[in-house]
Structures are given as structure tokens and as C-alpha cells.
């Protein structure tokens, strides 16, 4: 008995000490990005290369069901990894990661299917694009590759589209325009691949003559960073013209701007932990994109734990939140769960998310998990992780953060008409170019107060693809008898309008 008591006291002490280490939990915000990377390059996450189309579709559906059931609200689907396409492209060949053969039609349009399936579940889909990468070691040689091969920059085994060439900028703009205009994506996102890491800046550099002949007064490093910035600006401007509600962001390496002189240039504090290898390694300057308002959000890959000496999450992540706030932009921090091995790691990620919620502007933050396979594809452990996140930090659904700098289009406030409950179904009249939020709240709750409580939010609904006059929503069984329901119009910018109620 004494041993049991002693063990119980020890366990209580350990748990109390651990609890003191974690930030006190906050109420989940009503608006927060909750996303995951879906990597298609090398078959990292999806699909199984060469599998039949129906099997690939079924796997994506299983993935999305898991995310939706655990209150995620978006995915980042990689649709261009090696100057290829996971969609019907006018410019580039079908990806080999679909069928095993570059240029071979997979029998369906994966991006169109993914957009449809995400929106059926009230989830956003952000098209993840690698802007420059062409290939590694092996040279692609389809008919559509021939033009690109005349505009390559090589360093070691890496081939990329030459960032200095106007042809490259035009190609990337055209690719992004095609994705934005042909597909109902909610966002465009780049990762952290720009110039090849470690590319020389001396006379041995493959673009040394190009820089010399450009007539610029910039150093070769500044010239390279400006080449990247010109491309980023061109894509941002195109999206604003074509579909101004579509978000555009970049996910750079996790540490930037550790130099005091560079921080002074931007009027910010230097990043307090880690080493900025990207500025002179891949010639990426993320703070310039924030300061220049060339992006809507930054999604830094802060893939280190709290207390890690070389780059402490508790120092680096708040710095990104603060820097994004200074320039009136959003920080959606990318967190790594790639080394998921045991349940003992779960509290670390909950603690990291609490740090983000306390440091990002209210309703302006979010998280992207690297990567999705750890959330649904590790037998037993993935399910436990999702249940843990839902129980501790994702207790309720959430909406996407607003982007007020894009949200300047005046429109007459939409109204939900003919809202009815019939058995387990809500129906209402479709409003063109709108989405909807659905709420369920006890009949004792004041109708003027329900929308301020995130716990009453059931989720978001898109208009049906096939049109028609009515929208339908299935009510969860446990809410049908004692709850009343409200539906609010939600425009493509995320503005929520006055509710309509069931009788």
C-alpha cells in the first residue's frame, strides 16, 4: 500500500510539473486555419503511384473524412511539384506521380476531384505549387518539357526554371492563373524551394554571366532575391485581378532575419533563435514579402520543439506572429509531426498550438501540419493523435480567418431565404457566389448571442456544384430534438452576414 501511495504521489508531482510547463489552454477561436500538407511528390502522402483512379479517389476521400471529423478546415494539396500537373494543364505534362509515366493521363482530374470533395465537406483547398523545380538528376523529356528545357538553371544535380528569365515569371503566372480560373480553389501556396541550396555566388555560379550582363547595380545575392520577389509580386497581382478572394501565401524555411542589419532594414527585431540559412542559401527573403504586401499569409516551417537549443519553437513562432502582425498579414505556422512514434509526443503539439493562439492576432492565426499521412495513415497512432487534438485544441469547428486588406468589395448584404427543417434536413434557397455557416444552439439560448459562441458552430457549407435552387444540410442526430438552427450567408471573402432561423 505504501508503494502505491508513494507512486501515486510521484505521478501527481510529475503531472503537475508537466502541466506547469504547458501554457494554460485558451478557448478555441472562431476563426483559425487548421490544415495539413498533402504531398504528392515521390508519393509521400498521396496518391499511390500507378494505382487505379478509383483507388486513388477512395484514398483521398478517406483522408478528407478523417480530417473533417476532427475539425480540420483545409488542406494544402500539392498540384505542381516538378513543373508537372495534377490537373488538366495547358502548359505542363501530367505528373508521373499519378501513373508512373510523365505525361500520361490518369483517367480523371485529381484537382477537380479534390476541390469537389473538400467543398462537399465545407473544407477549403489550397493549391500547393512549387514554382521553380524542374527535376533532380533525371531530365524530363515529354513534348511539353521541350520548351522549359531551354530555360533551365543547373546547380549540381538540381535543375530549376531560371528565376532571372522573364519566360519563367510568365510561365509561373500562367500556371497559377490556370489553376485559379479553371478550378474553384480557395488559395495558392508555395513551399520553400527557390534557388538551389548552396548555389555559388562566385564566378563559378551558373548564372554569374547572366547577372553580370543584366546591368544591375545589385549584388548577385540581392539580384537573385529580387528575381524571386518579381515573380511573387506578379502572381499576387494576377490573383487580385482574377479572383481577389483567393488567398496567396508562401511557406518559407522556419528561421529568417537573424541579422541585426537586415532586421533594422525592416524595422523589426531579429529572429531570437536559430540561423537564417535561406537568405544567402536559397535567396529567399520572407520579410520582404510581408513588408511589400506581396502575400496574404506566411506559413513558416517551424519544425522544432519547445526548448530546442538551436531553434526554440517558443521563441521562433511568436516572432513570426509578431512580424506578420506588424505588416498586417497573417502567420499560419507549419508544425512537424513527421516523427510521430508514441502518444507521449502529443502534449508537445498542443502546447505549441497554445503558443500560437496567444501570439497571433485574434482570429488571424492557424496551423498547417506536416504532413497528412501522420494524421490518418499510421494504424492506431494517427487515430489517437486526431482524437487528442480534437479533445484538447480542436474541440469545435472553425472558420477561416478574414483577409480585410482584400475584403473591400461593396455588396448588398445577402439573406438566407426559405430556411426550413424537415426531419434530419435543413434546406434553404441558394445564393449565388456564397457559402454558409450553420449553427445549432439550445432553444433556451438568446438568438442575439448564439453566433458569439464557437461551440454552437456546426461548420461551413458550399453551394452544390450542380446548381439548383436549394441547399441541403444534414443535421447531426443528437441535435434534432432540442436545438434550434440558424444559417448565415458567408461570402467568398469570409464575411458572415445576419442569420436566418428555423421556426
Q: Language-model segments: which ranges?
A:
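Beta-strand-rich modules
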Residues: 475-497
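Polysaccharide-binding and catalytic clefts of secreted carbohydrate-active enzymes
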Residues: 80, 121, 149-294, 303-304
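Catalytic domains of carbohydrate-active enzymes, especially glycoside hydrolases
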Residues: 58-84, 182-183, 288, 294-298
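Recognizes extended acidic, P/S/T-rich segments that occur
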Residues: 437-480
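Pro/Thr/Ser/Gly-rich low-complexity, intrinsically disordered linker/stalk tracts
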Residues: 391-433, 494-503
